[in-house]
Amino acid sequence: MSAENQEELLDYSDSEEIAVPTTTQAGEGESANDKEADKKGSYVGIHATGFRDFLLKPELLRAIGDCGFEHPSEVQQVCIPQSILGTDVLCQAKSGLGKTAVFVLSTLQQLDPVAGEISTLVICHTRELAYQIRNEYARFSKYMPDVKTEVFYGGTPVKRDIEKLKNKDTCPHIVVATPGRLHALVQEKAIRLNNVKSFVIDECDKVLESLDMRRDVQDIFRATPHQKQVMMFSATLSQDIRPVCKKFMQNPLEIYVDDEAKLTLHGLQQYYIKLEEKEKNRKLSDLLDSLEFNQVIIFVKSTQRANELNKLLCACNFPSIAVHSGLPQEERIERYKSFKEFNKRICVSTDVFGRGIDIERINLAINYDLPNEADQYLHRVGRAGRFGTKGLGISFVSTKEDEEVLEKIQSRFDVKITEFPEEGVDPSTYMNT
């Protein structure tokens, strides 16, 4: 992080010493601090074989069954038993392991809805992710008719949000929001957070690495009660950002499922193609013609390139859709929904789609433009191969800078990315049968 981001952070008390939390790799034996962990109710050794083992509310189990989920993922096995007890949680786990379900199920399990009182606050950095999290709450609370969830983000009329919050009948129990809009509502005294029991940040590294966003979050945090549960999740948590996250917590349970060198995704085939910039369009067309895929997401580095490439694909009879931050908010959401509902199979996007967005049919991710950072590569290709399914990631390498990023990716994630074979790849290696 840059020096300017090393701002003094909100803490509970200068004199309060934060005890060393239990930290472990999921699935490993007890750490050296096992005695201390026992005192706090360590999660070590708790491995549920089904969601019923978590003793969740019948309404939640019924909704989980409707979704077709039988067995919790590794991160869910580790997190849920402690998070439903109100323990603070800092969790890093690779894309596609169901981190969202951890905090959605945990907060719904603990929720006792009271009219006009906001009990759960979830903060995320993009509007699309906020929309998706709201939908997850709707999915898992379908048999809890008294529970109301609302999403608040910029680009929509703030008066509409204020009206919903003023009325006891429409005031939600669960708020999912982006930091800017939520901060504005707090400043206007339009939202009452004095009853918040759960404070969640998804993709917390992205939210807290920006100084402006972090200041907003600190102000929001101060408006909530001192005693509450704090949970933070991300696929990437650098050593620099972890202490920043823990400043908001009290004795958190720290869970790092796989260390930093092993954050690669199960079932994902990864390749690169060396070519000149002017050759990209022809190669992309060839790939879309020759590869089998359900849905594909193509990442570019700017909104202008997204629009241009989208026009080109449509002109070449590849019906695509573009999603990027340059679109009006309502249009962005409509396009996101259209792609998610399988109305289009090809999406051209900037990094607005690169984090947390979960569309289960995507099994091909193409980096038309490589990202500048290795971590962003993980979030991008993680759109394919979600929840342990197969997928294919292909990256175009056209400059010296691209070659350097590719080297960083392979070093950072301890993975060998090979050149895409001339004869192509067997669909069975990346398509689920």
From Swiss-Prot:
A motif (DEAD box) lies at residues 202-205. It catalyses: ATP + H2O = ADP + phosphate + H(+). Residues 80-255 form the Helicase ATP-binding domain. It is found in: Nucleus. SUPFAM superfamilies: P-loop containing nucleoside triphosphate hydrolases (SSF52540). Residues 1-39 are annotated as: Disordered. ATP binds at A93, K94, S95, G96, L97, G98, K99, T100. This is ATP-dependent RNA helicase SUB2. The gene is SUB2.
